[in-house]
C-alpha cells in the first residue's frame, strides 16, 4: 500500500513506521526532522512542518493518490478541518489518532459506544472537538475516516509515569532515594500499552476495507493500579521506592499544568472492553505484558 504518515517518529508512532516498512509498504513520512535517527532505512522522508504547508508540499500531497493517510499530530478542530479539505477525494482511508483520555470517569469497562466525555482536561476536550469534525465529515461528505483511540502508550525509549513529562526522571528519583509522587492512594486502575502492540493493530486495520466511519479503542486488556505499576519498577530496579501519596486535587491547586493530566485522566479507573476490535483482529490480546515492556524501557534507560 501507498501510505502517508504525518509524524511517525514519536513515542507512539515510531514502532508503526518500522513495522509497516518491514512489511514492504510504500511509506512516506512528513516530519519536522527533529528525530531523524528514528527513521526506518528505506522510507521516503520529507522535512516540513505540516502546520505551514508551502506550495511544493501541497503539490506533492495532492498529486499523489494515497491508500492510507495517518496523521499522528491532530490536536484541534482547525487541524481536522484542514486535513478534510486537503485529502477528501484523494485517499481511500484516513486515520485520526484520537485518545482514550476523552472518556470521563466511568465505573465499568469502557467500550467505543460510551458517550461520557472528559470536560476537565483541555487536551481531551480538543480531541473530542476534532473527532466531532471528522464524524460530521464522514456523514455529510463521505470522508473516509477511521478514528483510533489509543490509551497511555509507551515504547522502549520512554518511561511511563503518572506525572506527565517526568519520564526518565523517575529512574533518577528512584536511584537517588528521592520521594516519588503518587496521586491519591495509588489504587486507581490504569492501562498501559506498548507501541509495538499499537503498531501491530494499526497494521491489521490498514488492511481492512469496510471500516470507514468506525471508532476503535487500541489499548491493552491488562490493567494495574498505579501502586502496582510502581512495584514493577521496584522489582526491575531492585530498589525500594520512597513513595509520597498526595491528593490529586492538591497537586492541581499547587501546579495546574502538572495536576491537570492527573485530575483529568490519570486518577480515573481506565479498564476497557475490547470486544469490538477482538471480532476483527483474532490475535488482538497477544500483547506485551507490562512487566516485560517496562523491562525493555528500563534497559534502554541504562
How should each PLM-predicted stretch be described?
Residues 195, 252-284:
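Conserved C-terminal active-site "lid" loop/helix of NAD(P)H-dependent oxidoreductases
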Residues 162-171, 182-207, 213-214:
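Substrate-positioning beta->alpha
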Residues 134-159:
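Conserved beta-loop-beta element that borders a ligand/cofactor-binding pocket
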Residues 60, 64-109, 125-136:
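NAD(P)-cofactor binding segment of oxidoreductase domains
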Residues 285-302:
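Amphipathic terminal alpha-helices
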Residues 155, 182-188, 216-223, 232-235, ...:
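Glycine-rich Rossmann NAD(P)(H)-binding loop
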Residues 3-23:
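N-terminal Rossmann NAD(P)H-binding glycine-rich loop of SDR-like oxidoreductase domains
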Residues 204-262:
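Mid/C-terminal beta-alpha module of Rossmann-like enzyme folds, strongest
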